[in-house]
Amino acid sequence: MIRTVDGRRIGYDDSGGTGTPIVLLHGFPLDRTVWDEQAGALAGRRVVRVDLRGCGESEPSDGPALMELLAGDVAALLDQLGIERAAVVGHSIGGYVTLAFFRMFAERVAGLALIASHVAADAAGGAAAGASVTQRTLAAGRDALALDLERTGTMEPAIASYLPRYLAPAFYAERPELVERLRAVMACQDARGCAQLIRGMQVRVGGEDLLADVRVPALVVAGAQDTYLDPKTLRAVANAMGAVYVRLENVGHLPMFEAPRATGDALAAFAQRVG
């Protein structure tokens, strides 16, 4: 489905159903189809899956895709769908958007879930005072990737950078058909739009100050073999906001692909708590 939201095309799916709506926000550089395997676990619920700018069927951003802009897109789409309040679930960058949505529209959040997503800022692209050498190095790499995406006009630079690291080693080696499926999802995204998503992530505001304000059902899912995030850090995030913490063994940065049933079960239990 496609709607025009504030003059911009936004891709989404709306399952219909009962209960508090569940909004699913995908990671980078992916789209709303990454949640396909969780549809069964959430059957009967109203589930809205959204494509972020530059991904799937959504138009790319004209400038840096700030998390606040993306959260505003979600809010405007929910307005059009007649949804006043929803539980928001975000994977990776989708988690950043989830936190931005909570900061901007806390009264509309009935539940909050972070899937392989952290809350700390990226030190303003590594240029902020106090940024570590590691942060600066990572930021420089992301800056270069954004430029490569714009220069080539293809997703190949992002695929080469992210695909091998997103999955647990055993999964990457033993499930070639799913690796190719993931590659295909990445390949069909808008390269220039994804460059703007990178720039938006670089300057995002951290969400540590929000955690104590979470008074709704919350969930944090971590992959034990995630090379981007330390599960211990995500456990601390869960503790800080009183969330249920689910650690998935032999899983990397993509629980929806690597452990679809366990991820679906976690989301179903979360949805039940939301009501």
Predicted regions located by residue number:
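Conserved HGGG/HGGXW glycine-rich cap/lid loop of the alpha/beta-hydrolase fold
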Residues: R8-G63
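Conserved alpha/beta-hydrolase catalytic His-Asp/Glu region
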Residues: A124-L138, T152-D213
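Conserved loop-alpha-helix segment in the C-terminal half of the alpha/beta-hydrolase fold
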Residues: D213-V251, F257
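Residue in the alpha/beta-hydrolase core beta-strand immediately N-terminal to the catalytic nucleophile
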Residues: D51, A87, A110-A113
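Post-His helix in hydrolase/transferase enzymes
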Residues: F257-A271
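Flexible "cap/lid" loop of the alpha/beta hydrolase fold
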Residues: L99, R103-M104, R108-G153
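Gly/Ala-rich beta-loop-alpha elbow adjacent to hydrolase catalytic centers
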Residues: G90, G94, T98
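Conserved acidic catalytic loop of the alpha/beta-hydrolase fold
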Residues: L69-A86
